[in-house]
Amino acid sequence: VRTTGAGGGGPVTWAGVTLARAAGAYDIVSLAVPPGPAWESARPGQFLVLPGDPARGEVLPTLLWVAEVSVDPVHGTAVDVVVPAGGGWATGQRVRLIGPLGRGFGLPAEPVPSLLVGQGGSVVPLRWLVAVLRSKGCEVHLVLAADDPEAHLDLSPLRRQASSVVLTTPGDLLGVVAQVLDQQPGLGVVFAAGPRAAVREVAAVSQSRGRASRVCALDLDETLLCGTGLCGQCDMSVVDPRGARTTRPCLEGPVVPGEWLVDAAR
């Protein structure tokens, strides 16, 4: 692995695929990357950009959530990403990447019961967040939505770590979230990731019930995203202490206070 130069969001790093394991509809791929303080401080909600390579017919960049980071003084630094099953990631393959990018989920200063809400492939950062919150003494509950029951990612470890896991469909997601919040008044904060419209609605449901929320305002499943702030494709309207404005989640987020999205929709 080595760093080769500057990219739109930071240095372009060569990383090596060390392991790819099947996880239902996905493959979890481990990458060996050069050690550094950015990886040591990485947190759930950050992402990577794999630059396009026109010579290989890859015009657009690929954006991937950081699924987990392991820093070991002996074995080095490993970064996990999640890709569709059979995506062609082979052990020994070398890939270029930029990252970790963005602002991830902030952690509560004290242990607090937390609800994590995810839809589709955006559950990837929440998978890591569950483990981090549990290590901080937080009780964790999950609501996960997918169009196909087979599309849920790696449920077994989530069920071992979380106090409860509720599976639903995108159409029923908001109703289930509202029900969980009503039934468990001790839940203090909601973390959400998914399509922008979905996380905005989750934030609104949370706010209406007096819960703080932190949401991923960047949906990596959107097309034509650059991830480095150049394209403007992810621009969104928000209302924050500075007033109404347009923000670029790949730079200011992707994790933002849920009320930013709720107030902008009014």
PLM regions with names:
Residues 42, 58-60, 108-110, 228-229, ...:
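Short glycine/proline-enriched turns and hinge-like loops at secondary-structure junctions
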Residues 53-57, 98-105, 240:
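Short, charged beta-turn/beta-strand-edge "cap" motif at the junction between a beta-strand
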Residues 66-70, 251-256, 263:
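A short, sequence-level motif marking secondary-structure junctions
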Residues 221-255:
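Local cysteine-cluster metal-coordination motifs and their immediate loop/turn environment
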Residues 246, 258-266:
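A charged, well-structured terminal subsegment
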